[in-house]
Curated annotation (Swiss-Prot):
Classification via SUPFAM superfamilies: Hemopexin-like domain, Metalloproteases ('zincins'), catalytic domain, PGBD-like
Region described as Interaction with collagen: 268-471
The protein's name: Collagenase 3
Region named Interaction with TIMP2: 176-246
UniProt remark on domains: The C-terminal region binds to collagen. The conserved cysteine present in the cysteine-switch motif binds the catalytic zinc ion, thus inhibiting the enzyme. The dissociation of the cysteine from the zinc ion upon the activation-peptide release activates the enzyme.
Residue positions, PTM Phosphotyrosine: 366
Sites where the protein binds Ca(2+) 3: 179-180, 182, 184, 202, 205
Glycosylated residues, chain numbering: 117, 152, 158, 409
EC number(s) recorded for this UniProt protein: 3.4.24.-
GO terms (BP aspect): bone morphogenesis; collagen catabolic process; extracellular matrix disassembly; proteolysis
Gene3D superfamilies: Collagenase (Catalytic Domain), Hemopexin-like domain
Amino acid sequence: MQPGVLAACLLLSWTHCWSLPLLNSNEDDDLSEEDFQFAESYLRSYYHPLNPAGILKKNAAGSMVDRLREMQSFFGLEVTGKLDDNTLAIMKQPRCGVPDVGEYNVFPRTLKWSQTNLTYRIVNYTPDLTHSEVEKAFKKAFKVWSDVTPLNFTRIHNGTADIMISFGTKEHGDFYPFDGPSGLLAHAFPPGPNYGGDAHFDDDETWTSSSKGYNLFLVAAHEFGHSLGLDHSKDPGALMFPIYTYTGKSHFMLPDDDVQGIQSLYGPGDEDPNPKHPKTPDKCDPSLSLDAITSLRGETMIFKDRFFWRLHPQQVDAELFLTKSFWPELPNRIDAAYEHPARDLIFIFRGKKFWAPNGYDILEGYPQKLSELGFPREVKKISAAVHFEDTGKTLFFSGNQVWSYDDTNHTMDQDYPRLIEEEFPGIGGKVDAVYEKNGYIYFFNGPIQFEYSIWSKRIVRVMPTNSLLWC
């Protein structure tokens, strides 16, 4: 039996070893006994401690707290060793069934295929899609990996393939039972004989070729990464990140983290059709520029490319998320954002459209057009926006101009637009992002931010953009 399969079986055999509550919570979080049971089951499934021989380290409460700390670190959360609302929310997101630690990295050798010509076979189909749609999704998913490596994938219709693909429910014959709708979506085994390379999909899910339900192509591309020998990635922008996020209808490009991982196993291919693979931003990059900033219920949301950093007022370390993991309906990248606290809304802009999220939910009737706010046709996008609660005014920045909007009358103020350089001397002719706090406006222009005093109407400090993220 393949060592990875043996480790998986040993892992599962200890799944129900503990019954006592082994975790503590933050006092401010109202968590139920069911929440603790769910969290402990999650940690046993995805953060089960194995030694190199594949044997469980039974250390009861201490071990479980260690697993929780490891899980919090893996997902970029504040590492407390205590169960809290943010940690539980991550645990409850739909995800891959392969453990985040242990199974792939307990063996001293690298798990990879010795040959570059691999076969796959579709054993059965989901009733959610036509046979043609399923076949197209799997073919496209394999192409994600063959585009950047020397690997070739050929479908066979009979016999045993290197990668056997099947749909099943609950206990389906491999000691890794599925759990019904949501939760665990699919799993795959590392390269090798027997189960090695095989990918299984939970047929209690609703599989689609769109944003509804779970997109089969995206889940399959992730699982086939495991079939080729990849672990889960800590990079929230990576395809191999364990949590499912629908990333949009546009042309899929394999992120750089995944390219580096798969090429470390198999090397590069002859010709990459997408030589520029998206990278996850580094918050401490000295040349960091931002797309948008807004507050949201006391937190600060800092947008860059497909991502945003979520900065809690009591924490130094910002958490990084894909924008679509919070708001699947939004574009991958945004231009501007601001909060309207009195309405408990944020407004998010991209091109000539804007959306109004209330928490995770976007209000009905959105997106709307910029013209609804009174912008003329020649305004193609908003580059930054900031709302002032005491005056009911919102400033919009577009190109080298600034506009003032009256939220009470729902009209643009007269004598606007004005030139940014004349209205706020010294900050330059454009604004990438802006926010207001304690009587100061913070303007971001490339790698520089300007602290501007509303009272004295002058710049009082100039700082690097990345200092906002404690760099």
